[in-house]
Amino acid sequence: MEVELTNIQKATSSDYWSLASNQYPCGKFPKVSVGVTIPRTSSVSRGRDAASTAAFEKNLSQGTDGRSRPPKMDNASLQVSPEAANHGGSAKEVPKPVPAKVSVSQPDDNAIEQTGTFSFGTRREQDSHLDQLDRPPLVSSQGKRQVESADKNKPNSEMLRMKLWEILGGTSQNKEAVASPNPEDIETPCQPKSQIANGPSSGRQKVFTSPVPYNIKTPAQFNSQTANKPSSDPIESDSDSPQVVEVRPITRSLGRKKEPTGSTHQDKSGSAKKPLSTHRSTPKQKILDNVFAFNDKCTPKTVGKSANGESGSLRNLRSLSRRAKVEPKKAHCSDRISHKTTQDDMERKVPSKYIPSEKKGEKTNSFSSLSRTGKTAESCSRSPKRERRVNTMANVGARKMQLSENLLVKTLNDGEHKLSSPQLTSFKSKGKCSSISPQQKENDNTHIPEASDRTAARNSFNSTPSPAANPSPVLRKYSWEHDENPAINGKSGQKDASPLADRFSDMPDDFASPTFAANIKISPHRSKMLDDDLFSSKYPKGVNRSRSTSFTSDPESEPLDKMEKTNELPGSESPNSQEERQNRKQPHLSPLSPIESEGAQISIPSFRKGYKSHKWLSDVDSPDKSSIEHLGRKSHLKEGRKGKRQLTSPTHFATSGTQETMSDKEPEKVPENYLTRAFDQLVVVLGRFQTKIKSETRNKSSKILAATGEIIRQHLEGVEGQMQADVDKLVNAGKSKRKRLESTFEEQQEKLRILHEKFKEEVNQQLLGCKNSVEDFEAYHAELKGVADKQKASHKKLLQNAEKTVGAQLSDAETKIAEVQKRARKRMKGLKFVLKELIAETAE
């Protein structure tokens, strides 16, 4: 892979922003020259190198978003430190050239070149120099700057990233880099993962698989940004304030020994024309092919930067590495890249720069993923053809963009709008389909400028091109040439993604996906189909599209979800970042190979399935498309858990020629406000659950009371019947006896009357008889009274028994009701406890 320095210089309107320019001293990192090919020693452990490469690229993807990249300036691109290139936040904070500072703390160009182990224009041979470099010297400087950056970084975003990373299970592949006690590995979240190479001299060296350079700026952007030059090592913190500039430790080479400037310069000049060395065994190359690094906006980054140690790429790598250290699992799916470059596009993109003439086919296959993922602005800056293309795009980008869109519309209407299977697979794994909505096509066709530059650039860069995106090789010789012009690319990041970025920020129902962006040109029919499947009750409304985009690209950040939350506002990115994302955005428009087109068709159903499988709380609030992740984003959320978090380990791409297949384990990201929305939806769910519990409790209580009342009623009826029977019996017996007594008394009276006549004779006898009758009557009365008293006592006992029975029934009913209420309260307490834990986890 030869780096054509002259071509790069020609491609750029100014040598200042030509990162490949070799007119600057090699000893100064700020002055980056592309094309240094460092012979890579065979001692580099392939397994670890590949693993760390994958992890690093994923970390780079998560760590490098438009927010953290400094706007490039005419001289700033050559003068800025690597961190400044990556994290120079807004346009106001353009890195300032500090050659002395950089030369002291940074590794030499070779060490920096090492970071570009496999980037466009970078040779794998550079790993040997990397292996030979000593790591310790920069550790202290890194720690120092790390402390500085830590103060400026908002802990919330880092904590959220870490949380999401854990949820996503990001430690699986990047466990080595993450578990490393090294401050470079852990403390600097933006620090990219480095491949561990066992160099002959340093023993174990970290070879940074730096992301593809993305700080190329059009002359217009440079002119607008020339005045602002921040310190040599400014990086934008991940906090919500994009203006915060952090000076992170120069850990690009992770303490590698700085080689002499002369040797570095020689390496640069020598490697400029050398093809990429094929030392790497085929397995190693395959591993690298499968490795894709993406920034938070899913900007593909090849597992390597230019070996010539360009200051812009080094700075980007360092800032990215800081993030990557904390978020090793941030494997951002380069969906658009996976299918965006065919073999021919790869050969065109990397004609002599990456592929030796005798092994160009082999290099195309082995580095197809790299070339596809690495077609970022930074790599373009180092690639002479990319520089030339950038220059050309400034002039004819609008015309090509118009033609491309016209052809795209026609092709999409013809049914040729096939998304690549890797892209759809990544879509499925991430569940991010917001960019393929019908609005996306509108955004692609409208080219409306957007105030949110980073969002626009991110969306446009992250978009997945359909085969129609590349109307023809003639119309767009290079995949990134289709829509570049200074107005769209450099100044406002307005490209097709701008409307989509607006959509991301304005459309609450859809969760923006970095993998899908405005460049995806899908027919209304396909868009509607995807919208129906992908945007149904998936994510909560009000999701910040730019945040969600960068956030979804981070598997660790769901949420979510499953959830890295980029705290920077979409409009905060600098024009440089915009143009860089535009430049990176270009490669994904290369025509899809037939295989990729077929894969795209096949992948759509599975993508929908995977996308739906990542729903966290979709049933909670379907209108809001809740994914209380991601809530797995996060929910993640969804999701955040956020789960919620269907988020998985970083995506690997299986590269076959120019086709990469993204693994279904692509983590899902969640926007920062995802937690709030998740909480709101959880509150809604809690309210519904509470209402349901209360309703059930009332129903059960009513049933219990009704049953108890029926039992009591029946019992009382029985008691009443028994009492009535006893009373009736007593009354009947009394009446009969009374009747007999009355008859007897009447007879006695009658006799008395008779005897009255015989008064004297029989008066005593009759009086005695009456007296006896009266006595008998009194005795009966006493007896009757005694019987009545007995029955009264019996009835009293019956009433007492009935009362006891009724009380027991009522007590039983109350006990049952209390148990029901207790269970309801217990459930509510459990739900509240789970909710608190969820809120605590998501808040962390």
Curated annotation (Swiss-Prot):
**Where is composition skewed (Low complexity) in this entry?**
459-473
Function recorded in the entry: Plays a crucial role in homologous chromosome pairing and synapsis in meiosis. Does not seem required for cytokinesis. Is essential for meiotic bouquet formation, homologous chromosome pairing and normal recombination, and synaptonemal complex (SC) assembly. Required for the proper association of PAIR2 with chromosomes.
Location in the cell:
Chromosome; Nucleus
Q: Where is the composition biased (Polar residues)?
A: 106-120, 191-208, 218-229, 364-382, 420-440, 545-554, 646-661
Record note on disruption phenotype: Sterility in both male and female gametes.
The biological processes this protein is annotated with in GO are: homologous chromosome pairing at meiosis
- Note the InterPro entries from the entry: ASY3-like, ASY3-like_CC
Q: Does the keyword 4Fe-4S apply?
A: no
Q: Domain of life here?
A: Eukaryota
Q: Where is the composition biased (Basic and acidic residues)?
A: 122-134, 145-164, 256-270, 324-363, 441-456, 616-640
Q: Please give the name of this protein.
A: Meiosis-specific protein PAIR3
Q: Could you list the residue ranges that cross the membrane?
A: none
**Segments of this protein annotated with the region Disordered:** 41-389, 418-506, 532-604, 616-669
Q: Which residues form a coiled coil?
A: 731-765
Tissue expression? Expressed in pollen mother cells and the ovule tissues during meiosis.
A GO cellular component annotation in the UniProt record: nucleus
Q: What are the entry keywords?
A: Chromosome, Coiled coil, Meiosis, Nucleus
